């Protein structure tokens, strides 16, 4: 999925670099003086001070972003302080504790709630001059888009097809900031399955009202990961006007409305195209 500038926003004070021992997989320390430099096109540059490694010692850098606005369970004194309490824990133990909440009737709004993201660097030593590393960041949520006839719109003699409301049914209310599902080496695939192990979910609905969509509604609907079983499956109720009538139809998370359901997987976009009525 392509990322818009708004989706890729990272700000100082809400990005964290964890230095993980490459052998033991335990957290050694956090980079405390982290700075974000945004003057590099579509890249984000993070600068900070690291401790030199000794001999053959290697570390990996875990980058976590946009946690403050996402109601991380168990956090009361701020994320940096919370993460510092986990020095000595394994990366997996830390990941299991980083659960964001998405509750209430209000849909996700990027102006008020940045998207939680995670990435990890290759193993490296830290020379006196410091390492220069790259990593890709993966969003902890999936994205849903609705197109009308391939974003060309639909018309008849009585006017345009207009989407006036969307209800997301049975969305999960939380998710892990970091997935422990296997990350594919193929960047076009990324994650292939959701990771929701151990989470107790409460299904909920989100309502988008007052819409006037004739071409596309995209980059606005975000969902936690979900094993999309027949019992309580996520779906979209789309209310529209066309041909002088107002109707509501349900869109299932299936290819062409039939077959097996799509699971909801982070960092993927699910595009549903309304091509005919």
Q: Can you describe what each PLM-predicted range is?
A:
Residues 2-83, 124-128, 143-266:
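Tryptophan-paired
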Residues 81-143, 147-151, 256-277:
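Extracellular beta-sheet/turn segments enriched in Thr/Pro/Gly and aliphatic residues
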